[in-house]
């Protein structure tokens, strides 16, 4: 059931309820990066992980599997977090690696990669004069950032993206917070990535439970995929109804939740 973000119970205020759901199961903790682990900033290159958040991830990774799944390139988010113990997934889960040789099989054809390259070149040429617009060419996607674009120019940005989507039928549109994406038109998203990871780690619903924390509309696929057998926590709001079951206010709230979660897990589930 989808709800407004304001209707969700606060994850820290209802922490004991979350721990009851987890029970004796081993959690798989999965987090988005931008807007969840690091505040959203006008320049995506300046989204930095705080020392406190990094310490929380280090502590948790010692006792449970921890993954970061981002729309960024995997190498980018891996460099920003810079912790060897974690599992990293870029391009909404298309590119994933982790400890002990964990790696997701390649799912994107050379044909699609060629289309992404051509579309990126076209968009960079078309939008180079739009002040504040950033065309970010990634390994498996193109992100067009318009957060800093003047309101009267936003439509021009959107039209350019639509034009490329019409030109390249093997690409599809993705949306986020002040971002438009062109990505492979294949049946893959964060929800499928979470399910794949859960199985790849030899976890099952009887002994394990996924806990996903994210802030963006792209995280809804993950929330929806674990609604019955996991816990979804929405950070802030993305303006649409959500399949998440709990909420946190912001990245600071995420940090407080992770610290409380670690202390509880370390104490073998005793509150």
Write out the residue ranges for each language-model feature.
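Mg2+-dependent phosphoryl-transfer enzymes with acidic/Ser/Thr/Gly-rich catalytic loops
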Residues: 1-11, 24, 191-271
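Short, basic, glycine/proline-bearing loop/turn elements
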Residues: 2-4, 36-44, 209
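Short amphipathic alpha-helices and their capping/turn segments at secondary-structure boundaries
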Residues: 10-25, 75-81
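Asp-based phosphoryl-transfer active-site loop
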Residues: 22-43, 68, 194
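A general structural motif
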Residues: 24-26, 63, 85, 139, ...
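Hydrophobic "anchor" residues on beta-strands that sit immediately upstream
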Residues: 28-30, 87, 211
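Active-site phosphate-binding/coordination module
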Residues: 47-138
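Conserved acidic, metal-coordinating active-site core of Asp-based
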Residues: 130, 136-213, 217-226, 230, ...
């Amino acid at each position: 059931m989808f709800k407004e973000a304001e209707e969700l119970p606060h994850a820290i205020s209802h922490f004991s309820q979350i721990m009851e759901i987890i029970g004796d199961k081993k959690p798989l903790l999965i987090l988005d990066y931008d807007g969840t682990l690091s505040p959203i900033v006008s320049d995506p290159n300046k989204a930095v992980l705080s020392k406190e958040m990094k310490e929380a991830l280090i502590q948790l990774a010692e006792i449970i599997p921890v993954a970061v799944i981002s729309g960024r390139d995997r190498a980018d988010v891996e460099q920003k977090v810079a912790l060897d113990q974690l599992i990293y997934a870029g391009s909404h889960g298309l590119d994933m690696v982790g400890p002990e040789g964990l790696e997701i099989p390649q799912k994107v054809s050379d044909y699609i990669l060629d289309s992404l390259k051509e579309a990126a070149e076209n968009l960079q040429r078309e939008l180079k004069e739009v002040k504040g617009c950033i065309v970010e060419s990634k390994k498996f996607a193109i992100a067009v950032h318009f957060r800093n674009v003047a309101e009267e120019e936003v439509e021009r940005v959107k039209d350019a993206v639509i034009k490329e989507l019409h030109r390249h039928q093997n690409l599809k549109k993705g949306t986020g917070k002040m971002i438009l994406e062109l990505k492979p038109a294949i049946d893959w998203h964060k929800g499928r990535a979470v399910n794949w990871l859960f199985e790849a780690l030899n976890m099952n619903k009887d002994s394990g439970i996924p806990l996903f924390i994210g802030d963006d509309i792209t995280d809804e696929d993950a929330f929806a995929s674990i609604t019955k057998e996991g816990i979804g926590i929405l950070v802030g709001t993305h303006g649409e109804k959500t399949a998440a079951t709990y909420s946190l206010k912001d990245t600071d709230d995420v940090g407080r939740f992770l610290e409380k979660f670690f202390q509880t897990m370390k104490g073998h589930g005793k509150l």
